[in-house]
């Protein structure tokens, strides 16, 4: 995956902004500082594809109290931005879709990315 399309603003919660680093990576995934080439196990949601559409449709059936914006997946794990966070640096929620009680919160995309690069999941 060399690049990916973001969900358009009309699909996002009012006031929500993607993190700047995420936007840059969407245009060039080689900006991810991989430990080894092609060793990044997460796949970014690519707006306009069936997978991204399905992730978006089912986003609120997972944890209905949260306004989730799906952005990456790795097997049964899905990463979401907190759509209620309008700071421009939203927290990230990673959920095991096979067991939604198994989920983690991260303060930012950069914090999540650091662990994703290390293949923590």
Segments (PLM) and residue ranges:
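A surface-exposed partner-binding patch
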Residues: 1-77
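Pocket-edge structural micro-motifs
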Residues: 72-73, 83, 96
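Broad, structure-driven detector of short, well-ordered beta-strand segments within folded domains
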Residues: 77-85
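Compact, glycine/acidic-enriched structural inserts
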Residues: 98-121
